[in-house]
Amino acid sequence: MNDTLALLQKFNAHPDSRCWYVAWNPKGTLLASCGGDRTIRIWGREGDSWECKTVLQDGHQRTVRKVAWSPCGNYLASASFDATTCIWKKKNDDFECLTVLEGHENEVKCVAWAPSGNLLATCSRDKSVWIWEVDEENEYECVSVVNSHTQDVKHVVWHPTQELLASCSYDNNVCVYKEEDDDWECRATLEGHTSTVWGLTFDPSGQRLASCSDDCTVKIWKECQPEGGQEGTDAAWKCVCTLSGFHGRTVYDIAWCPLTGALATACGDDGVRVFKEDETADPDQPAFSLSAHVPKAHTQDVNCIAWHPKEAGLLVSCSDNGEIAVWNYQSGV
């Protein structure tokens, strides 16, 4: 390992609470965090450090599990254990709650915007994935409810350029969805993990998907076009690589750097790891090596990892101990 992962700053973001998730706005000027204290905190850079700019605390009655910025950066969505999703509008340095999306029967575990900004996906412990459409008046309408998982759905993520959605679940599977005749349906089920799948990330091209699991592995799935290339036939997703033996406990989150292609993981063994792809390997049989590892990045489980969208190598992680850590990853090659 010639590469380094250096700590730039660590701060107590959600005191006496878990910090569940962190998300950069599209420009990378703001970082949103959420936690068990029912708050969302917005962080901005002041010189070399990150300072809390505002606290959103009136939206939810229970833990806020995930936050997601709209592609334009003017809206923030928050998913909560109170079974609702709040949509916040940025107004100068402040945020106001525009609307509350209701319908899930249990905790909402994740929320994600499509690259167009016109669609939003939510998922829940009620085993369902909901697709919401956003109109010009900022009205949100549920256009599809998909029940393709048999257990709690942990995470949803959109393809970087297409209206293609993936979800993962306590049922050990990953589902890939597309719209068909005005309805969304599961077009592929990716089976291979032997325990809960916690997180998903597309590579910058959208041709590959990485999943992380309670089985302590990371799997890389590649989109394979059907033979003969018939029109209307769905692409299949094939597992082309499994990273095993690197993580000591559950891998809770995974992030593919949009700038460098490095893959970072957040783990229940308190560690943060970065993997690098062997560029000489066959694309159909990719190989990844562990390039940097901080064994005790936090004193408790690491819940989330997020690459900065504009600065290569800048990475944040957050933990059950309420902390956020800011890292600089440098490749030795």
Curated annotation (Swiss-Prot):
- Kindly give the CDD domains that the UniProt entry links to this protein: WD40 (cd00200)
Could you tell me the keywords of this UniProt record? Answer: Repeat, WD repeat
Q: What processes does the entry annotate via GO biological process terms?
A: iron-sulfur cluster assembly; protein maturation
Top-level taxon in the UniProt lineage: Eukaryota
CC per GO annotation: cytosolic [4Fe-4S] assembly targeting complex
User: Which InterPro entries does this UniProt record tie to the protein?
Assistant: CIAO1/Cia1, WD40/YVTN_repeat-like_dom_sf, WD40_repeat_CS, WD40_repeat_dom_sf, WD40_rpt
WD repeats (start-end)? 14-53, 59-98, 103-142, 148-187, 192-231, 246-285, 297-333
Biological role stated in the UniProt entry? Key component of the cytosolic iron-sulfur protein assembly (CIA) complex, a multiprotein complex that mediates the incorporation of iron-sulfur cluster into extramitochondrial Fe/S proteins.
User: What do we know about how this protein assembles, alone or with others?
Assistant: Component of the CIA complex.
Task: List the HAMAP family.
Answer: ciao1
Q: Would you identify the family this protein belongs to, as annotated?
A: Belongs to the WD repeat CIA1 family.
Q: What is this protein called?
A: Probable cytosolic iron-sulfur protein assembly protein ciao1-B
Task: Give the species.
Answer: Salmo salar
- Gene coding for it: ciao1b
